[in-house]
């Protein structure tokens, strides 16, 4: 959940061991997104940077406490994906 993620990230700011675990999880998630983005033809640094932007966008969305309905998120999903991936999917 977003609240759990935020709480763990706050904890990680104060505990190096927790920070190491959070970083490892973040790295795995970014690696998974990189593989996904590579399926759309991006390679190397471009795939990694697009994956990071996508991940940081989602983490930031939760960190800022954004609130919108699922309907609104689904409506905007194609726009987000075009901005993050670079073309319509």
Predicted features by range, described:
Residues 12-13:
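Acidic, metal/ion-handling microdomains and their immediate structural contexts
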């Amino acid at each position: 959940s977003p609240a759990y993620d935020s709480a763990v990230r706050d904890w990680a700011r104060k505990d190096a061991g927790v920070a190491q675990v959070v970083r490892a999880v973040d790295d795995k998630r970014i690696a998974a997104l990189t593989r996904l983005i590579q399926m759309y033809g991006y390679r190397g640094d471009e795939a990694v940077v697009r994956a990071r932007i996508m991940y940081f966008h989602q983490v930031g969305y939760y960190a800022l406490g954004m609130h919108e309905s699922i309907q609104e998120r689904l409506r905007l999903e194609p726009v987000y994906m075009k901005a993050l991936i670079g073309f319509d999917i």
